[in-house]
Every structure is written in structure tokens, then in C-alpha cells.
């Protein structure tokens, strides 16, 4: 699952040094602050716009049915990416006859044994992306939850469905042809959530082989 965030600590030593080197009388400092305030306000507004991300589609179910391809894949093997301390390299059978490699930031949460053999749900038409020297073709879907004060991750799985089974909204046409590739911005135009321990989009259930995708521990949270 490649969209899992990796937190980087921020060190504030530069601020202390700047205060020592550029100390000014109160009146002068106030003038400088007055001159720079408009620029800071503009920067904050620009930053806020960037953090908003892509807007959700007006009709999320229709958009999902037309653009986003999910399918079941079986994890055959797992290895650690030596260049990324949180990344697994997962080799999967996606039903196409050719192995698919997906990277996900699950090492802090799940062991290799937890992953091998799982019938996971993947975003299969996301454009390939190189991460830490290895091309990742798609994204593994999961949800998070808290247990005993500790953040944990639960895979979205469909153990009853063979590799390659389409994952669609209830009642949707499984044979509908979707784009071969979409970018992450298009993928993020739909919000997938766990509600009542069931994967849903705008109140409609996600299914594999006509059976709903459910969780056992994650609930009332976003799928990522």
C-alpha cells in the first residue's frame, strides 16, 4: 500500500541560531514583522490549498464504476526493501498469468507471515511508480484501528475469491472496461470507508464474487 505516510522528524535548531544572530530591539523587530506578515499570510493560504488535495467526484459511485479498478490478488512472497525501512516488496498473483509487484509501508505493522497467502484487495490500474529503486504496480488496500493505545493495520481481504476476481460496488457490472492506467489524483476522487465493518463508497458496499468485503477490527475509518 504505497500511500501510507512516513513521518519525518523536524528539528528546530535553526530557529535558535537565527534568534541569536538576528536579535533586534523591539521596535525594529515589530517593523520587520509588519513587513513580512502579508507574505506569510500568502504562504499559509497557498499551503492550505495544497493540503486540500483533489476534490471528490460529485457522484462517487458512478466515478468509481467508470475509472477505478480493484481486484483480488494473492500474495505469493514478501521481502524487505533494503532502501526503505518501512517498505515491503510483495509479489502477487493477480490472475493475469504474470506476477505483479506492489510495495507497501506495512513493515511496522505486519510480519511477512501475516501477508503471505492473503487474498488482498488491490488498486490494479494505478499507474506504476518507482519507490526506493523498485517499481510498484498498484496499491494494496487496508484500514487502521487502535488496540491498547497502539495503531494497527488490517488488510482488506476476500479469502473466498480467486486471484483476478473484480471488486465492484454491489449491483455493478463486473465486465465494464475501465482505463488501463489512472493517476493517484483520479484515484483519490473517491472516498472509500469502512462503515459497520463493511467496505463502502457513498453507502454502497464493495463486493468480490457478490460477497461484501468486511473487516473484523477496523470500523468508521478511511480505507487507504
For each of these PLM feature ranges, what is it?
Residues 1-224:
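Phosphate-backbone binding interfaces of nucleic-acid-interacting proteins
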Amino acid at each position: 500500500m504505497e500511500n501510507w505516510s512516513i513521518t519525518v522528524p523536524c528539528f528546530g535548531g535553526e530557529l535558535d541560531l537565527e534568534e541569536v544572530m538576528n536579535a533586534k530591539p523591539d521596535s525594529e523587530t515589530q517593523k520587520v514583522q509588519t513587513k513580512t506578515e502579508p507574505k506569510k499570510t500568502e504562504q499559509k493560504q497557498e499551503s492550505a490549498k495544497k493540503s486540500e488535495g483533489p476534490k471528490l467526484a460529485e457522484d462517487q459511485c458512478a466515478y468509481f464504476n467508470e475509472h477505478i479498478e480493484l481486484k483480488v490478488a494473492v500474495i505469493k512472497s514478501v521481502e524487505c526493501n533494503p532502501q526503505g525501512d518501512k517498505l515491503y516488496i510483495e509479489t502477487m498473483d493477480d490472475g493475469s498469468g504474470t506476477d505483479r509487484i506492489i510495495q507497501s509501508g506495512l513493515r511496522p505493522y505486519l510480519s511477512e507471515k501475516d501477508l503471505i497467502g492473503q487474498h488482498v484487495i488491490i488498486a490494479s490500474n494505478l499507474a506504476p511508480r518507482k519507490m526506493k529503486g523498485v517499481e510498484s504496480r498498484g496499491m494494496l488496500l487496508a484500514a487502521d484501528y487502535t488496540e491498547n493505545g497502539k495503531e494497527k493495520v488490517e488488510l482488506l481481504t476476500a479469502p473466498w475469491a480467486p486471484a483476478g476476481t473484480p471488486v465492484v460496488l454491489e449491483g455493478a457490472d463486473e465486465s465494464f472496461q475501465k482505463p488501463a492506467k489512472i493517476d493517484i489524483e483520479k484515484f483519490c476522487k473517491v472516498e472509500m470507508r469502512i462503515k459497520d465493518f463493511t467496505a463502502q463508497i457513498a453507502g454502497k458496499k464493495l463486493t468480490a464474487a457478490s460477497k461484501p468485503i468486511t473487516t473484523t477490527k477496523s470500523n468508521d475509518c478511511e480505507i487507504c
